[in-house]
Amino acid sequence: GDWFYWAFEVKGAAGKTVSFVMEPGYVGYFGAAVSHDLYHWNWSDTATAANSFTYTFGENENDVFFAHDMLYHPSRFHKFAELRGIKVKHLCDDNKGTPIPYAVIGEGKRNIILTARHHACEATGDYIMEGIIDEYLKNPIPDTRITAIPFIDADGVVAGDQGKNRRPHDHNRDYLDTIYNGVRAVKEIAGNGDVLAVLDLHSPWHISGRNDKIFCVRNSEEKLDDMRLFGRCFEESITPDAMKYSTKNDIDPGVEWNIGKERTSCSSFCRDIPGVELAFTLETTYFGEPGNVVSQEKLVATGRCFLEGFRNSAPF
């Protein structure tokens, strides 16, 4: 598949105005994401075309990070967990040795599994996960805990890989003939018999159309009514500080590219596990669009709304 993801650091350009050309055309509507610490990100708002942006470095601005989108560095998850009193544990080592962290939040007989970064570059899902966890801590779901795995492709995350369409297959096509340690660990947790839901958090394609929105990928005809109910409750739970969401952008099974029959993805594999009431993918845009522009704060707020929608839709 096409490789649209990029990130780099510029040193020693203080006082200069520089134009960056990213062929063949992978610059978002609002320019590059810009950071000085890999934690706080803003848009440059200087896209000159679909393939370029400019940046004027301040007189003392000697070290700047630029990226396709607002990255979510693993250190942010650890800092978030520390501030919230969450113990981060070691799930396993990835295939190249990178530790894969996870956290169990709350207590209860039932388990909600949150996964992100099956595709290494899809950082928006981690902001959503952070918001879900934050909302849960304020208002737990009775007798239900959360197992959060923020970096399934941990090797790819630390290497700066895009991760999608790896060969022989990527992490979200690994649930039958499993070769990745992180996926193997998810399958083990999901098979423990106590899982209520598996919520897999992704980012879509680079840009345009539905990719500028937030949308759910529904994957089960049998659970279609439950997933549509969740969508309505999620939409009703959206607050002014969150990204906009409408069920009209969701995609049903058998529509457009959502036609996979094999259970190779996380949500399609987990939907058939006995006891699992909901398993689906949430796709969260990298950029948004005018009037609905992605920011770190808005993504986290959207995660809070997501959990509220889940809570309000749960008939189980």
For the regions a language model picked out, list residue spans one by one.
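Hydrophobic beta-strand residues in large extracellular and virion-surface proteins
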Residues: 8, 18-20, 32, 146, ...
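Extreme N-terminal flexible tails
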Residues: 1-60, 64
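Active-site/substrate-binding loop(s) of hydrolase catalytic cores
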Residues: 88-267, 271-288
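Extended acidic/polar, glycine-enriched regions
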Residues: 47-97, 106-107
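His/Asp/Glu-rich mid-to-C-terminal helical/loop segments that flank catalytic regions of hydrolases
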Residues: 289-316
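Residues that cap or initiate secondary-structure elements
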Residues: 14-16, 26, 59-61, 72, ...
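Short helix/loop capping segments that flank catalytic or ligand/cofactor-binding pockets
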Residues: 74-77, 122-124, 290-291
